[in-house]
Swiss-Prot record:
<feature type="binding site">
    <location>
        <position position="163"/>
    </location>
    <ligand>
        <name>Ca(2+) 3</name>
    </ligand>
</feature>
<dbReference type="GO" id="GO:0046676">
    <property type="term" value="P:negative regulation of insulin secretion"/>
</dbReference>
<feature type="binding site">
    <location>
        <position position="120"/>
    </location>
    <ligand>
        <name>Ca(2+) 2</name>
    </ligand>
</feature>
<protein>
    <recommendedName>
        <fullName>Visinin-like protein 1</fullName>
    </recommendedName>
</protein>
<feature type="lipid moiety-binding region" description="N-myristoyl glycine">
    <location>
        <position position="2"/>
    </location>
</feature>
<feature type="domain" description="EF-hand 3">
    <location>
        <begin position="96"/>
        <end position="131"/>
    </location>
</feature>
<dbReference type="GO" id="GO:0045921">
    <property type="term" value="P:positive regulation of exocytosis"/>
</dbReference>
<dbReference type="GO" id="GO:0005829">
    <property type="term" value="C:cytosol"/>
</dbReference>
<dbReference type="GO" id="GO:0016020">
    <property type="term" value="C:membrane"/>
</dbReference>
<comment type="similarity">
    <text>Belongs to the recoverin family.</text>
</comment>
<feature type="binding site">
    <location>
        <position position="165"/>
    </location>
    <ligand>
        <name>Ca(2+) 3</name>
    </ligand>
</feature>
<keyword id="KW-0449">Lipoprotein</keyword>
<feature type="binding site">
    <location>
        <position position="113"/>
    </location>
    <ligand>
        <name>Ca(2+) 2</name>
    </ligand>
</feature>
<feature type="binding site">
    <location>
        <position position="79"/>
    </location>
    <ligand>
        <name>Ca(2+) 1</name>
    </ligand>
</feature>
<keyword id="KW-0519">Myristate</keyword>
<keyword id="KW-0106">Calcium</keyword>
<dbReference type="Pfam" id="PF13499">
    <property type="entry name" value="EF-hand_7"/>
</dbReference>
Length: 191
Protein backbone atom coordinates (compact mmCIF):
# COMPACT_ATOMS: atom_id res chain seq x y z
CA UNK A 1 0.00 0.00 0.00
CA UNK A 2 1.55 3.28 -1.07
CA UNK A 3 1.31 6.78 0.21
CA UNK A 4 -2.11 7.86 1.44
CA UNK A 5 -4.02 10.87 0.21
CA UNK A 6 -2.81 14.03 1.93
CA UNK A 7 -6.39 15.21 2.49
CA UNK A 8 -9.36 13.54 4.09
CA UNK A 9 -12.33 13.01 1.78
CA UNK A 10 -15.17 15.46 2.56
CA UNK A 11 -17.51 12.67 3.72
CA UNK A 12 -14.80 11.26 6.02
CA UNK A 13 -14.14 14.74 7.43
CA UNK A 14 -17.85 15.27 8.04
CA UNK A 15 -18.11 11.91 9.80
CA UNK A 16 -15.08 12.61 12.01
CA UNK A 17 -16.35 16.07 12.99
CA UNK A 18 -19.57 14.37 14.16
CA UNK A 19 -17.81 11.37 15.77
CA UNK A 20 -15.05 13.19 17.65
CA UNK A 21 -14.53 16.27 19.80
CA UNK A 22 -12.21 17.80 17.18
CA UNK A 23 -13.12 20.51 14.69
CA UNK A 24 -12.24 20.40 10.99
CA UNK A 25 -9.04 22.45 11.37
CA UNK A 26 -7.78 20.22 14.20
CA UNK A 27 -8.59 17.07 12.26
CA UNK A 28 -6.63 18.35 9.25
CA UNK A 29 -3.62 19.04 11.49
CA UNK A 30 -3.82 15.63 13.17
CA UNK A 31 -4.19 13.91 9.80
CA UNK A 32 -1.16 15.73 8.40
CA UNK A 33 0.91 14.66 11.42
CA UNK A 34 -0.43 11.11 11.28
CA UNK A 35 0.57 10.75 7.62
CA UNK A 36 3.99 12.25 8.34
CA UNK A 37 4.61 9.59 11.00
CA UNK A 38 2.73 6.84 9.12
CA UNK A 39 2.97 7.39 5.36
CA UNK A 40 1.06 4.16 4.75
CA UNK A 41 -1.91 5.55 6.68
CA UNK A 42 -1.69 2.70 9.19
CA UNK A 43 0.21 2.29 12.43
CA UNK A 44 1.34 -1.19 13.43
CA UNK A 45 2.11 -2.40 16.96
CA UNK A 46 5.86 -1.90 16.65
CA UNK A 47 5.44 1.70 15.46
CA UNK A 48 2.89 2.34 18.22
CA UNK A 49 5.29 0.97 20.84
CA UNK A 50 8.05 3.26 19.54
CA UNK A 51 5.76 6.25 20.13
CA UNK A 52 5.19 5.17 23.74
CA UNK A 53 8.93 4.78 24.31
CA UNK A 54 9.36 8.47 23.42
CA UNK A 55 6.78 9.49 26.03
CA UNK A 56 8.00 7.11 28.75
CA UNK A 57 11.80 6.95 28.35
CA UNK A 58 12.53 5.88 31.95
CA UNK A 59 10.60 2.63 31.93
CA UNK A 60 9.52 -0.20 29.67
CA UNK A 61 6.38 0.98 27.87
CA UNK A 62 6.13 -1.98 25.48
CA UNK A 63 3.58 -4.03 27.45
CA UNK A 64 1.30 -1.08 28.21
CA UNK A 65 1.56 0.02 24.58
CA UNK A 66 0.32 -3.44 23.52
CA UNK A 67 -2.80 -2.99 25.65
CA UNK A 68 -3.37 0.57 24.45
CA UNK A 69 -2.89 -0.63 20.85
CA UNK A 70 -5.50 -3.35 21.32
CA UNK A 71 -7.94 -0.76 22.67
CA UNK A 72 -7.25 1.68 19.80
CA UNK A 73 -7.52 -1.08 17.15
CA UNK A 74 -11.33 -1.27 17.13
CA UNK A 75 -11.66 -3.60 14.13
CA UNK A 76 -8.91 -5.95 15.36
CA UNK A 77 -6.96 -5.98 12.09
CA UNK A 78 -3.58 -5.46 13.77
CA UNK A 79 -3.18 -1.86 12.61
CA UNK A 80 -4.53 1.52 13.65
CA UNK A 81 -5.86 3.70 10.86
CA UNK A 82 -6.47 7.42 11.22
CA UNK A 83 -10.12 6.98 12.17
CA UNK A 84 -9.29 4.57 15.00
CA UNK A 85 -6.45 6.80 16.14
CA UNK A 86 -8.40 10.07 16.18
CA UNK A 87 -11.52 8.54 17.78
CA UNK A 88 -9.46 7.06 20.62
CA UNK A 89 -7.51 10.30 21.01
CA UNK A 90 -10.77 12.24 21.13
CA UNK A 91 -12.11 10.05 23.94
CA UNK A 92 -8.92 10.01 25.98
CA UNK A 93 -8.19 13.73 25.64
CA UNK A 94 -11.60 15.39 25.32
CA UNK A 95 -14.22 12.76 25.98
CA UNK A 96 -16.75 12.86 28.78
CA UNK A 97 -16.01 11.11 32.06
CA UNK A 98 -18.42 8.36 30.96
CA UNK A 99 -16.60 7.86 27.63
CA UNK A 100 -13.24 7.72 29.40
CA UNK A 101 -14.57 5.11 31.83
CA UNK A 102 -15.83 2.96 28.95
CA UNK A 103 -12.46 3.28 27.21
CA UNK A 104 -10.54 2.40 30.39
CA UNK A 105 -12.82 -0.57 31.04
CA UNK A 106 -12.15 -1.87 27.53
CA UNK A 107 -8.42 -1.57 28.10
CA UNK A 108 -8.57 -3.53 31.37
CA UNK A 109 -10.96 -6.16 29.94
CA UNK A 110 -8.23 -8.04 28.08
CA UNK A 111 -10.37 -10.83 26.65
CA UNK A 112 -13.35 -8.61 25.83
CA UNK A 113 -15.85 -10.71 27.80
CA UNK A 114 -17.40 -7.73 29.59
CA UNK A 115 -15.71 -8.44 32.93
CA UNK A 116 -12.36 -7.54 34.45
CA UNK A 117 -10.71 -10.32 36.45
CA UNK A 118 -7.91 -9.89 38.97
CA UNK A 119 -5.48 -11.41 36.46
CA UNK A 120 -6.51 -8.90 33.78
CA UNK A 121 -6.23 -5.95 36.14
CA UNK A 122 -2.86 -7.14 37.43
CA UNK A 123 -1.59 -7.37 33.85
CA UNK A 124 -2.42 -3.70 33.21
CA UNK A 125 -1.25 -2.43 36.61
CA UNK A 126 2.09 -4.24 36.19
CA UNK A 127 2.42 -2.75 32.71
CA UNK A 128 1.84 0.74 34.15
CA UNK A 129 4.46 0.17 36.86
CA UNK A 130 6.98 -0.95 34.22
CA UNK A 131 6.10 1.90 31.88
CA UNK A 132 6.65 4.76 34.30
CA UNK A 133 9.92 3.37 35.65
CA UNK A 134 11.16 2.73 39.16
CA UNK A 135 12.11 6.26 40.20
CA UNK A 136 8.87 7.85 39.03
CA UNK A 137 6.80 4.98 40.43
CA UNK A 138 8.39 5.45 43.86
CA UNK A 139 7.34 9.12 43.82
CA UNK A 140 3.82 8.33 42.60
CA UNK A 141 3.35 5.32 44.83
CA UNK A 142 3.50 7.04 48.21
CA UNK A 143 1.57 4.23 49.87
CA UNK A 144 4.17 1.68 48.71
CA UNK A 145 1.66 -0.72 47.19
CA UNK A 146 2.88 -3.58 45.04
CA UNK A 147 0.87 -4.21 41.86
CA UNK A 148 -0.89 -7.12 43.62
CA UNK A 149 -1.79 -4.95 46.62
CA UNK A 150 -3.09 -2.21 44.34
CA UNK A 151 -5.31 -4.74 42.54
CA UNK A 152 -6.62 -5.96 45.92
CA UNK A 153 -7.40 -2.38 46.94
CA UNK A 154 -9.20 -1.66 43.67
CA UNK A 155 -11.19 -4.89 43.87
CA UNK A 156 -12.20 -4.17 47.48
CA UNK A 157 -13.73 -0.89 46.28
CA UNK A 158 -15.17 -1.99 42.93
CA UNK A 159 -16.23 -5.63 43.20
CA UNK A 160 -19.50 -5.00 45.06
CA UNK A 161 -20.87 -8.56 44.82
CA UNK A 162 -17.47 -10.11 45.67
CA UNK A 163 -17.45 -12.50 42.69
CA UNK A 164 -13.81 -11.72 41.82
CA UNK A 165 -14.71 -9.90 38.62
CA UNK A 166 -15.71 -6.35 37.86
CA UNK A 167 -18.53 -5.60 35.43
CA UNK A 168 -18.82 -2.35 33.50
CA UNK A 169 -21.62 -1.24 35.84
CA UNK A 170 -19.51 -1.93 38.95
CA UNK A 171 -16.57 -0.17 37.32
CA UNK A 172 -18.57 2.96 36.49
CA UNK A 173 -20.49 3.07 39.76
CA UNK A 174 -17.33 2.80 41.86
CA UNK A 175 -15.39 5.33 39.77
CA UNK A 176 -18.23 7.85 39.96
CA UNK A 177 -18.77 7.45 43.70
CA UNK A 178 -15.07 7.45 44.67
CA UNK A 179 -12.73 9.51 42.46
CA UNK A 180 -9.70 8.05 44.26
CA UNK A 181 -10.41 4.78 42.43
CA UNK A 182 -9.71 6.46 39.11
CA UNK A 183 -6.36 7.58 40.51
CA UNK A 184 -5.64 4.02 41.65
CA UNK A 185 -6.40 2.74 38.16
CA UNK A 186 -3.92 5.24 36.75
CA UNK A 187 -1.42 4.36 39.50
CA UNK A 188 -1.32 8.03 40.37
CA UNK A 189 -2.15 8.46 44.01
CA UNK A 190 -0.77 11.93 44.60
CA UNK A 191 -3.20 14.01 46.58
Amino acid sequence: MGKQNSKLAPEVMEDLVKSTEFNEHELKQWYKGFLKDCPSGRLNLEEFQQLYVKFFPYGDASKFAQHAFRTFDKNGDGTIDFREFICALSITSRGSFEQKLNWAFNMYDLDGDGKITRVEMLEIIEAIYKMVGTVIMMKMNEDGLTPEQRVDKIFSKMDKNKDDQITLDEFKEAAKSDPSIVLLLQCDIQK
